[in-house]
């Protein structure tokens, strides 16, 4: 038995969408600052290795791997709104906690907690963005959400580099302020769960959930690994090839991802999710390959733009595909499981690819994800031949 909770998607106006956009952009501007500040802090202040840098950066995603399925299930039971608000307060406290992290293990611990609470907020945002969108516009809704994310990523790393140059404490303080602002904005967001599932209502097993999202999830895992390598190793990569600050490369990546998200969601809604994801993975892998072989200071810029374009096409399309296979009352749980595949790719990238880069050379930090993206491309091709599955 279930009880009605709120009105259908049509009842949520543009104001709800705008408040969500502002909260997401503010939160991810803070996370973008950390993308450049944390690797420099571990490398320059704490003397960490490339593997340590990768671990400190991507442990964020390891925590998310465990958190998202639980959060998704809870959102289907008690609602979305609590998961849009209180995690932002905790993130503000954890940002200040970075100032007290004077060893690599302490940074890793803070990043682990940031991953748990940050992924809680993001999972809620992803579910809410599809709650308030008509079914035929789901990819566009996910693309708009990720557009707000990349507004933060476009400027955050540049700001992080700027602030870190003036003192390692300034990035953490700026992040705390941004998280608190996002918390204030989130108070304006309504509950969007249409029908609460009660404790005695049947729910799909984890095996059935994994069967539904396995192939799109594996394809997204391959993209997630490459994305994590971009954010984890770009500060050291830019210095190794003689560019100095990574801010310009981060900005190029984020701007290319922003640009493609303006229309990738609409293309996926119109022509099909797989039709956008397949070429996206190809371009994504090619960009990593070019970064791995770049011998000039100009080639990394078009190469990293290709990775941004590829990821910007892949993520909204595959996310919408997962949502499309889920009944409304189980959307949170399905999205939680799907996003965990992305988190798994993110989590293994830092320590595994970082160790390879330490042993074989920094260029393998992008050579490995190029190979993995090729595998993801093959998996995505298989989605064209597989029939749609759903939990219903």
Descriptions of predicted regions:
Residues 61-69, 153-154, 257-258, 262, ...:
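Residue-level signature of mid-helix packing/kink "hotspots" within the transmembrane helices
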Residues 47, 79, 100-105, 272, ...:
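Helix-breaking motifs and short loop linkers at transmembrane-helix boundaries and internal kinks
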Residues 145-187:
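Helix-loop-helix hairpin linking two adjacent transmembrane segments in secondary transporters
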Residues 89-102, 283-295:
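C-terminal ends and interior cores of transmembrane alpha-helices
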Residues 105-113, 287, 298-306:
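Paired small-residue
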Residues 112-148:
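Cytoplasmic helix-loop-helix junction between adjacent transmembrane helices
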Residues 66-101, 268-271:
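Conserved MFS/SLC helix-loop-helix module at the cytosolic interface between two early adjacent transmembrane helices
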Residues 176-195, 379-384:
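C-terminal membrane-cytosol helix-exit motif in multi-pass small-molecule transporters
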């Amino acid at each position: 038995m279930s009880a009605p909770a709120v009105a259908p998607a049509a009842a949520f106006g543009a104001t709800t969408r705008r408040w969500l956009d502002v909260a997401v952009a503010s939160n991810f501007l803070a996370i973008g600052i950390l993308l450049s500040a944390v690797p420099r802090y571990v490398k320059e202040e704490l003397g960490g290795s490339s593997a340590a840098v990768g671990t400190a950066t991507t442990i964020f995603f390891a925590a998310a791997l465990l958190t998202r399925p639980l959060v998704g299930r809870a959102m289907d039971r008690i609602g979305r709104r609590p998961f849009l608000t209180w995690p932002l307060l905790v993130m503000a406290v954890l940002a200040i906690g970075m100032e007290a992290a004077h060893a690599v293990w302490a940074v890793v611990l803070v990043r682990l907690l940031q991953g748990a609470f940050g992924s809680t907020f993001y999972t809620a945002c992803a579910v809410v963005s599809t709650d308030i969108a008509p079914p035929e516009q789901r990819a566009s809704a996910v693309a708009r959400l990720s557009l707000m994310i990349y507004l933060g990523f476009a400027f955050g790393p540049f700001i992080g580099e700027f602030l870190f140059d003036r003192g390692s404490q300034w990035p953490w303080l700026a992040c705390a302020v941004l998280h608190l602002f996002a918390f204030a904005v989130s108070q304006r967001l309504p509950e969007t769960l249409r029908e609460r599932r009660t404790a005695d209502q049947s729910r799909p097993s984890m095996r059935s959930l994994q069967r539904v999202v396995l192939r799109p999830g594996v394809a997204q895992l391959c993209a997630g690994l490459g994305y994590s390598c971009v954010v984890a190793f770009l500060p050291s990569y830019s210095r190794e090839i003689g560019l100095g600050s990574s801010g310009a490369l981060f900005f190029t990546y984020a701007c290319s991802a922003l640009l493609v998200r303006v229309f990738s969601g609409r293309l996926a809604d119109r022509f099909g999710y797989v039709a956008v994801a397949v070429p996206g993975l190809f371009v994504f892998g090619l960009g990593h390959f070019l970064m791995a072989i770049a011998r000039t200071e100009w080639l990394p810029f078009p190469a990293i733009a290709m990775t941004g374009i590829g990821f910007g096409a892949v993520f909204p399309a595959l996310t919408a595909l997962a949502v499309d296979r889920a009944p409304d009352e189980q959307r949170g749980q399905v999205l939680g499981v799907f996003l965990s595949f992305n988190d798994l790719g993110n989590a293994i990238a830092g320590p595994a690819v970082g160790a390879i880069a330490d042993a074989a050379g920094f260029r393998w930090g992008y050579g490995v994800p190029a190979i993995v993206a090729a595998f993801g491309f093959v998996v995505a091709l298989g989605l064209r031949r597989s029939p749609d599955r759903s939990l219903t």
